[in-house]
A protein has these predicted regions:
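Donor nucleotide-sugar binding/catalytic pocket of nucleotide-sugar-dependent glycosyltransferases
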Residues: 122-157
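Membrane-proximal helix-turn-helix segments that form the acceptor-binding/catalytic region
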Residues: 104-123
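Acidic donor-binding loop of glycosyltransferase active sites
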Residues: 236-249
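N-terminal pre-catalytic "stem/leader" segment of glycosyltransferase-like enzymes
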Residues: 1-85, 282-283, 321
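A charged, aromatic-enriched C-terminal amphipathic alpha-helix characteristic of glycosyltransferases
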Residues: 297-334
């Protein structure tokens, strides 16, 4: 029997790198030294719960979202401990892009272990709609709940006046993750004749690749990785975010753009499909995304329409209040 002593949802990444972090008082203030309340941390933050790497502490919560990571061995051990404490255990993939999951489960032993864990879990929670068929093949209790964003909290509103927004922010960073289509989106951006900003995470090799595009000297700004608040401040100074990502991920870049109140064109992640129905890349060609980008750059009325739609749709479907409502419907002990 579980004698829960801690409130909210515990999100457990057993043995992971992120340190234990309490969200007892909600999302808090933007900070350069702690993990922001986004992605899987957001599930904890919107319920005033906590994110853990320690199974023993997570077991003090009534409901736990266990992240399936690596070869699943640590996740399996954590699952057994949590169930022995009487916790309600939901499971989700730590890296939930479709290609990431396919790679993780490519070995027969891992796939069998996944089936054992997921079929025994109280709930399979997917941050993307694309993994629902996989979960549904082993469990009758599956649900897609997109990762929420602290849109209703003033400290997390990074919006700037429209007349202070210039150019395009490239949402992807990695050349070597082929589903990101980073090379293709930069090639398209090269033709726009507007300021372009890109974050380089690949050091000198990335710089060589970026310089090979031969952008005009005053068009391309290359920035190293930044702390999250500085990254949002940089993004917010642009008219839009552009990406050709086809990784079927939860959609953190699109969520980041929501905090900046600027539209994202492209990307087929969960957040893109919800927040930007007229702009996402699910089922649209790269040519169509290029045309939408040009429309947003040059048609002020269309741009204003997308901003208005962003505010309405995002708050209705992706706010912390909506996240709490959705999670409470499926997991006990959150309210």
């Amino acid at each position: 029997m579980n004698f829960a002593t801690l409130s909210g949802l515990a999100v457990l990444n057993p043995g992971g790198r992120d340190t234990d972090q309490s969200f007892e008082h909600g999302p808090g203030q933007p900070c350069e030294t702690s993990h922001p309340p986004v992605n899987y941390h957001a599930y904890a933050a919107c319920t005033n719960g906590a994110f853990y790497r320690s199974t023993a502490i997570a077991a003090q919560h009534r409901s736990v979202l266990l992240l399936l990571r690596g070869d699943l061995s640590e996740s399996q051990r954590a699952f057994e401990v949590l169930k022995s404490h009487g916790c309600f255990v939901a499971v989700s993939f730590k890296e939930s892009g479709t290609q990431q999951v396919a790679g993780q489960l490519s070995r027969g032993k891992r796939f069998q272990l996944f089936r054992e864990i997921a079929s025994s879990a109280d709930l399979c929670l997917s941050s993307t709609p694309d993994l629902i068929p996989l979960f549904a093949s082993v469990s009758k209790r599956t649900v897609h709940i997109p990762t929420p964003y602290p849109l209703e909290f003033t400290p997390w509103n990074y919006s700037r006046p429209s007349d202070e927004r210039r150019g395009i922010f490239i949402g992807t960073r990695e050349f070597d993750v082929l589903s990101r289509n980073h090379l293709l989106v930069l090639s398209a951006a090269r033709t726009f004749s507007v300021p372009i900003t890109v974050i380089n995470v690949e050091g000198n090799a990335g710089l060589r690749r970026l310089h090979a595009f031969k952008f005009p000297e005053d068009q391309l700004t290359i920035t190293p990785p930044l702390p999250y608040p500085k990254y949002l401040k940089l993004m917010a100074g642009h008219r839009l975010v552009l990406q050709f990502d086809q990784s079927s991920v939860p959609g953190q870049v699109a969520g980041d753009s929501l905090l900046c109140r600027i539209p994202t064109v492209g990307g087929n992640g969960a957040v893109e499909r919800i927040a930007y129905p007229a702009l996402h890349g699910h089922g649209r060609t790269f040519d169509q995304l290029t045309e939408l980008t040009l429309d947003l750059m040059h048609d002020d009325e269309f741009y204003k329409e997308q901003l208005a739609a962003l505010e309405t749709t995002a708050v209705e479907h992706l706010s912390f209040a909506k996240g709490l409502e959705s999670l409470s419907r499926w997991l006990p002990g959150l309210t």
